[in-house]
Amino acid sequence: MANLEKIVEDLSALTVLEAAELAKMLEEKWGVSAAAPVAVAAAGGAAPAAAAEEKTEFDVVLTEAGAKKIEVIKLVREVVPALGLKEAKDLVEGAPKTVKEAVSKADAEELKKKFEAAGAKVELK
């Protein structure tokens, strides 16, 4: 314990330049870098914000069928060929429902325009 107290006293007596030189010498001796954890933490904090700003995939959600329900049902069947007439009708009548998931921004915008032209209300999430 006495050795540790002596080390603390010796380190406290160093000037800023001497402390910086000591840090460099320890980095070389131990093969580490004191700056790496700081850089990783800064990059890690910025990544989620960038991901939130640049969303590339969207879900097309039918929020309301509107007055032209038959046209909207036909469009749902066109967009999702796996759905039969009954499933498409149930989807439209059960709005809000997700019509397509993980669609590119351009495709999502195109689908939104088609649904709005058919009288439906659509959200991109």
Swiss-Prot record:
Name of this protein: Large ribosomal subunit protein bL12
Quaternary structure and partners: Homodimer. Part of the ribosomal stalk of the 50S ribosomal subunit. Forms a multimeric L10(L12)X complex, where L10 forms an elongated spine to which 2 to 4 L12 dimers bind in a sequential fashion. Binds GTP-bound translation factors.
Recorded superkingdom: Bacteria
Key words, A-Z: Ribonucleoprotein, Ribosomal protein
Protein species of origin: Hyphomonas neptunium (strain ATCC 15444)
Function: Forms part of the ribosomal stalk which helps the ribosome interact with GTP-bound translation factors. Is thus essential for accurate translation.
Pfam family, one: Ribosomal_L12_N
Record-stated family: Belongs to the bacterial ribosomal protein bL12 family.
GO CC aspect terms: cytoplasm; ribonucleoprotein complex; ribosome
Recorded GO MF terms: mRNA binding; structural constituent of ribosome
